[in-house]
């Protein structure tokens, strides 16, 4: 079963003669448990692709399906929940919030989503980090 399916994904930045097609009808699928690497030179559309898969930006054409659900059939509120609960993007250069300690950095996304921190899971994570 496909956990991710990208169909004819297109993203254009700018308008008219100043427009730039960052993605042009990109299609692929990923099966559950499969590992994928997205590689290419600077400016080849890797970040744009990931932003569209993760619901950070909206495509100009095409579809993204995560677990058979169309990511862009959601409204903005539903997309925000999707980003918080269903996908995660880790950038090459990520930053922790320097004024927060380790526990606060780990629990911040859960608290921002209005959920209670699972103390048992937190202890497991801290054990791994230690």
Predicted regions and their residues:
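Helix-to-loop junction immediately C-terminal to a conserved catalytic motif
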Residues: 54
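Conserved ABC ATPase "signature" region
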Residues: 69-70, 117-130
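A short, flexible loop at the N-terminus of ABC-type nucleotide-binding domains that lies
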Residues: 1-3, 12-25
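ABC ATPase NBD coupling module
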Residues: 17-20, 71-88
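Conserved ABC transporter NBD signature motif
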Residues: 62-70
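The feature captures the beta-strand-to-loop junction immediately N-terminal to the Walker
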Residues: 39-41
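Short coil-to-helix segment of the ABC ATPase nucleotide-binding domain corresponding to the Q-loop/switch region
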Residues: 100-109
């Amino acid at each position: 079963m496909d956990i991710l399916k990208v169909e004819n994904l297109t993203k254009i930045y700018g308008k008219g003669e100043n427009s730039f097609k960052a993605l042009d009808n990109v299609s692929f699928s990923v099966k559950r448990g499969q590992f994928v690497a997205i590689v290419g030179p600077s400016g080849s559309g890797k970040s744009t692709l990931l932003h569209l898969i993760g619901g950070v930006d909206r495509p100009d054409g095409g579809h993204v399906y995560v677990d058979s659900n169309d990511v862009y059939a959601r409204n903005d509120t539903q997309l925000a929940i999707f980003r918080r609960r269903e996908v995660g993007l880790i950038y090459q250069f990520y930053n922790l919030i320097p004024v927060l300690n380790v526990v606060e950095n780990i629990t911040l996304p859960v608290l921002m989503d209005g959920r209670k921190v699972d103390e048992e899971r937190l202890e497991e994570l801290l054990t791994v980090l230690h």
